[in-house]
Amino acid sequence: MRVAIAVLLVAVAAAGERLHVDHYFTYEEMTQALKDLAKAHPDLARVESVGKSLEGRDLWAFTIANPKTGPEAEKAAMYIDGNIHGNEIQGSEICLYTIDMLLNEHGKDPYLTRLVDERVFYIIPCVNPDGRVAFMREPNSPHSSRGNRRPVDDDNDGLVDEDGPDDLDGDGAIRMMRVRDPEGDYKTSPTDPRMIVPREKFEKGEWRLYGSEGLDNDGDGEINEDPPGGIDLNRTFPSNWGPKSEQAGTGPYPLSEPETRAVAEWMVAHPNIASAQSYHNNGDLILRPPMIYDDDRVPREDLETYDAIAKRGKQLLPDYDYRQVFRGLYPVRGGEIDWTYTGLGVFSFTNEIWDLKQDVNGDGKQDEADWLAWNDTVLHGAWWKDWTPFDHPTLGKVEIGGWSKWALRIPPAWMLADVCHRNATFTLFHADAMARVEIGEAKVTVEGTTRRVRVALHNAGFLPTVSGQAEQAKIGAPDIATIEGTGLRVIAAGRVDADGIRVTPVLYRPARVEVPTVKGLSTVWLEWVVAGTGDAVVTFRSQRGGAARKVVRLQ
């Protein structure tokens, strides 16, 4: 019924008509929405498949760029993705909302118009389409299905995916299952009989909790020990990757899965990507790398940049906490934003979308009781099913109850507008902060038959043209400044020191000067000595800061 209603709500039409992100899109709806948006804005947008998922679904990448304001490759690009974990679906809706807002407000909203004109946006709304489809179509808990759909032998019995949770009561959800047992580890909560809590060591038990409802499908005496797939896609990226002995969910080798290999290869093929944002759930968190070590290995200037962007993020997302993953959450090997930062050298964030963070029942704590109270009052009990007796074929009398798959991690659809807008606005602020190179003042001094040309290379963005990590690890192409002209001979070149007087000479190829980086909102001066007259063209190309050109009259 939920999917049927959602289909009726899809509305994408001609240019200028907004996409209604007021429900959770099926994969088919998302595909159609992306195609319709690209068709409605052919001058600014295109959609392409960058690969196939394990089950053969297209991985859609959406590009927003204005060719009238310059070549795509000569603009800094913001990469955005969502739904790398199958059950973390709202990231896709934020991506759709962002696409729609940028396209349909272009020419209307001055800020968004400038972003589209100056920047490029590469957006992959759903990295894990198979996981999304499985979550939406099949019975699940709030925490499944997380990985892709690769069959895995979790219990090492030579079979794959043969003993997963079962929707025993047929209500479309995988809930919890308990058995009354005086030796069990749990008791009924004294504050709410729906909850069970750990008993004290000296107390008599009341319940044995079996976790998700299910059967012993393979007859090995265990329940739900080998559920369907798969590989945790956010454990398969190359940077700091680790095998199963070091963390659960990883694949046999880095980029072993078609989904993440396609995404990684596509990103590498777009070296103008200067920043990255990935949407997950949940917890109301703004996360940054590193994911496997502390900040003592991170260039200080990069930490300052991260902190400044996150400070603005806290204004836009006031309930969110800002944390470094390794220190503030838990270690992650092979994480996406660890690779985009340490491997590609681009500033990267993950937002963990949504949490309750309310003391709804006024007891001074924030726990499951608050979720129950909020569900009772705001959702009229829709997310919770009371414990119900069930005759289990091997366990006997059990009770099944608890949360639906739509609970705890995913905001109700009517909250999507606020969730999408705030997170999209944070990411667009990050995109606006990316480097943007300009050529400022050019001074020409005549010295006999030669000319001394001093030029200001300016970065109008807040981010540096090359991150400290990229500079330290020698990632990507260097920034290059050139001077050329008809009959022009370049004799010497140098970088002007901070005092504006001394010049550090460039020893090789003076017509082509490498610039290590231009910090945010800063200027670097270069100087050439040339022989020739007429016009010279100075060009400054930054792989992640764009390109600028200036014609200089040599007199």
Task: Map each language-model feature to its residues.
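Short helix-loop-beta-strand segments that form the rim/entrance of peptidase-like active sites
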Residues: 91-137
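Sec-dependent N-terminal signal peptides
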Residues: 3-12
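Low-complexity, intrinsically disordered segments enriched in Ser/Thr together with acidic residues
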Residues: 514-537, 542-550
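Metallocarboxypeptidase
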Residues: 46, 59, 122-126, 130, ...
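Acidic carboxylate motifs that coordinate Ca2+ or other divalent cations, activating on Asp/Glu
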Residues: 153-157, 171, 218-220, 363
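Extended low-complexity, serine/threonine- and proline-enriched intrinsically disordered segments
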Residues: 470-489
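Short amphipathic, basic-aromatic surface patches that mediate peripheral association
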Residues: 457-471
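Short glycine- and acidic-rich boundary segments immediately preceding or forming the N-terminal edge
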Residues: 16-58
